[in-house]
């Protein structure tokens, strides 16, 4: 049982995709969808994403192109490290009117069977989940804000704990966008999000901090013609808690859109390896038609990175 507990601890903390051996519910830091993953997690200032509730809910209030949408994402996490880890994500939103938006999301993180207890012969299979609802509003022209409530449940499969534990957390977001003069359709945007503000998860024999994060980011959208469009974005993040992994990270990437229907993406994430935040590169592609879209992303990292060669697949629809 001790060995199995160590096995869980080894993978239990992944910050921004990442930190190791610290904190609880770190599946919340895994990039939630393929577009965001292809941009190395730089999503705090991007519009047009059904998964905005996980990134910055305020961005969706500023998006005038659709009334609602939903998507599903599958991530076989750490597939090179050990099979069986996976993240399933559902995200969506609905605009009540031109200024007010309701958002919803659900994430389920599955572990492989890690072994069998000596007593009772029960298999050990930890699992974690989060269910969340959010509200976003356009306060004034170009400026939006959001708030998200999140319920988190963590069950480490009786490894050192008699039962699962739960807690709640909140996110706060803000978003500003403005048109660029003398270039039709061009704009720049800035976003801010503070995520997972809440109490520790209290297990029967211990308590663990949530992966609290602050992010600020910016992007520029440049439609050169109806056939060619370029978007560039960057995020600066700071891990606020747990205290032993406080560190700065940076993500930057670009998205090229061809003929309005085909997207190609690439990005790089720089992190502090000593804090468990590995640096990595990502690439991805997507296509959309009649409101539906399909996106894919792939992560490249060094051989000592446990989540190298992870991929994301997202299927979504907006109207």
Where does each model-flagged region fall?
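Sec/Tat signal peptide C-region and signal peptidase I cleavage site
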Residues: 8-13
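Bacterial N-terminal signal peptides
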Residues: 1-7
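Subset of outer-membrane beta-barrel
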Residues: 14-319
């Amino acid at each position: 049982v001790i060995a199995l507990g160590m096995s869980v601890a080894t993978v239990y903390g992944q910050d921004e995709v990442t930190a190791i051996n610290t904190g609880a519910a770190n599946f919340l830091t895994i990039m939630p969808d393929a577009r965001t993953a292809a941009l190395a997690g730089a999503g705090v200032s991007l519009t047009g994403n059904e998964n905005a509730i996980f990134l910055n809910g305020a961005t969706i209030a500023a998006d005038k192109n659709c009334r609602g949408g939903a998507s599903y994402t599958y991530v076989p996490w750490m597939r090179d490290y050990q099979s069986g880890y996976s993240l399933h994500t559902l995200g969506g939103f609905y605009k009540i009117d031109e200024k007010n938006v309701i958002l919803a999301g659900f994430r389920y993180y599955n572990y492989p069977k890690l072994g069998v207890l000596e007593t009772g012969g029960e298999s050990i299979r930890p699992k974690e989940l989060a269910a969340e609802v959010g509200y976003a509003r356009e306060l004034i022209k170009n400026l939006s804000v959001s708030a998200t409530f999140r319920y988190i449940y963590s069950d480490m499969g009786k490894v050192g704990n008699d039962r699962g534990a739960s807690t709640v957390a909140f996110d706060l977001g803000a978003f500003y966008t403005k048109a660029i003069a003398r270039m039709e359709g061009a704009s720049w945007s800035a976003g801010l999000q503070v995520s997972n503000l809440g109490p520790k998860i209290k297990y029967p024999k211990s308590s663990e901090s949530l992966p609290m994060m602050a992010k600020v980011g910016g992007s520029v959208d440049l439609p050169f013609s109806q056939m060619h469009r370029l978007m560039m974005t960057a995020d600066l993040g700071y891990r606020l808690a747990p205290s032993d992994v406080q560190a700065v990270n940076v993500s930057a990437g670009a998205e090229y859109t061809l003929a309005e229907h085909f997207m190609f993406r690439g990005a790089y994430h720089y992190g502090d390896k000593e804090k468990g935040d590995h640096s990595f590169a990502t690439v991805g592609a997507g296509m959309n038609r009649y409101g539906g879209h399909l996106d894919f992303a792939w992560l490249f990292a060094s051989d000592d990175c446990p989540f190298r060669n992870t991929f994301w697949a997202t299927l979504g629809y907006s109207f």
